[in-house]
Amino acid sequence: MLAGCASAPPPEGTPAFGVLGDTPYSMREVGELDRLIDEMNAQELAFVVHVGDIGTSSLAQACGDAWLLERQKQFARIRHRFILVPGDNEWSDCTRHGLDPVARLRKWRELFCESPGEWCEHQRWETGDRVFVTLNVPGNNNNRGHPEMGPRMQVVERWLEESARLAESRDGLVILMQANPFETLRRDGYESLRAQLAALGRRMPGRVTLIHGDTHLLRDDEPLPGLRRIEVWGSPFVRWRREPLSAPPNR
């Protein structure tokens, strides 16, 4: 499924990174992901980012340790630097099984952070004269109504603002997270973040890119003035995007 105006991938030889999300959700997708990893390993990439949801939110998958351990082993096959963003299926949605989402997030950090600790999922680095930043913003209304949301979003918004200040003297800012903040409910868990993104679009027009997953609909568009949004493929499609490291010309 496509939405917006998808851009062509950068030509071979152009410095690039890989991004994917919302997979694998089945054993079929596990096999397809292995083949996709082989494909990425055959290319020169600065790094690879998975924007979260590495299984369904069932006890047999992303809410269970065994599935997460298998994904840890699978992702270890990626020869490039690999960054994983937490998705709602791995922690915040696990309340439907009577599990503590904060405990599940701690387990995720233990397995997937290089140095486990509070907020270790928030990473930031500079490549190609752009600042890249990861945010823990899960889908399914951002875990709205749970007491963890307020403190987490305070950290998220501070981290994003610090990153934006760094990016002002560079070519741009790339934000990577799981949730699609433009899919709103009557009680909106993304309102304050969306306002912050709108302000960044005004402040750095054409220099801010948001990459997310969540709604499994491939998009490349401008949902807010000055903000480019890329949504990656998701289950049942097991695909990745090759994106240029350097900022594209203003669209």
Kindly give the residue locations of the regions a language model identified.
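A short, flexible beta-alpha/helix-coil linker loop
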Residues: 54-57, 139-142, 180-183
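Extended active-site neighborhood of metal-dependent phosphoesterases/phosphodiesterases
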Residues: 59-158, 196, 203, 217-248
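Residue-level signal for short, function-critical loop segments
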Residues: 23, 88, 138, 179, ...
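Active-site neighborhood of phospho(di)ester-bond hydrolases with catalytic His/Asp-centered motifs
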Residues: 19-22, 47-53, 81-87, 175-178, ...
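N-terminal active-site segment of His-dependent metallophosphoesterases
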Residues: 5-65, 162
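His/acidic metal-ligating clusters that form di-metal
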Residues: 10-11, 38-47, 76-77, 126, ...
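Bacterial N-terminal signal peptides
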Residues: 1-3
